[in-house]
Amino acid sequence: TLGGNYVKRDGILKGEMISFAGLCKMACCNLAESFENSASVTVGYSDAISGARQIKMLGLAGTYTQILDENRPIMRGLSAPYGLSYTPGMWLNSIQVSKGISSVTAGHEAITGQINLEHRKPTDDERLFINFYLDDELRPELNLSTALPVTKDKKLSTILLLHGSLDTHLLGDMDDNGDGFMDLPKTRLGAVANRWLYTADNG
């Protein structure tokens, strides 16, 4: 859809879908920033020193929300508050959000809901995708993905995902309230992922 966010009603569970069009509206987004236009999920800072973010669903903290990577549980325990910032939004095809207690097929941690991430696939038709962002604080961010068939029959394909971002306060330390402490931490982030897919003759 043009809006990027819509409610799925064709499955067993009703849930919100954040499509790639919705993710493109937030060019600087990591996973934590991907929910800015979502009415189902609230994101805030849980630690101002490290910049860790925490999600809230149905008024409860993110520890009660199960986060899935293509229906596989991820971000358990201590990785939950920091993993949101380490997943670039431009690596995702879509995000599915379902509120309330759901199926235990993918795990039992979902009390307030589930968030499922669908990444870009090696079989994507878009062979090259480049995204560059620069905000008013001179924070740059670069995302690149390239999906290629390795063999002529396309049985073997791969995708390379690259991400880099800098938040070094080039215009000076951010201290809008004048308390002597930076409002945001300085960060440098680089991430690389390489996925392969082999399709056998028998499927």
Where are these regions (language model features)?
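Transmembrane beta-barrel architecture of outer-membrane proteins
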Residues: M26, N30, A52, Y82, ...
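Short, acidic, small-residue-rich periplasmic hinge/interaction motif at the N-terminus
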Residues: T1-C24, A32, G62
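Short strand-turn segments of transmembrane beta-barrel domains in outer membranes
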Residues: S94-V104, Q114, E118-P149, M182-P185
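Extracytoplasmic beta-strand/coil segments of soluble accessory domains associated
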Residues: A32-P73, N93
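Periplasmic-side early beta-strands and strand-to-turn transitions of outer-membrane beta-barrels
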Residues: D124-D125, A147-G203
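Outer-membrane beta-barrel proteins
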Residues: L78, R139-E141, D167-D173
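Transmembrane beta-barrel domains of outer membrane proteins
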Residues: S34, L58, S98, E118, ...
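Short acidic/polar hinge/loop motifs at secondary-structure boundaries
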Residues: Q54-K56, R72-K99
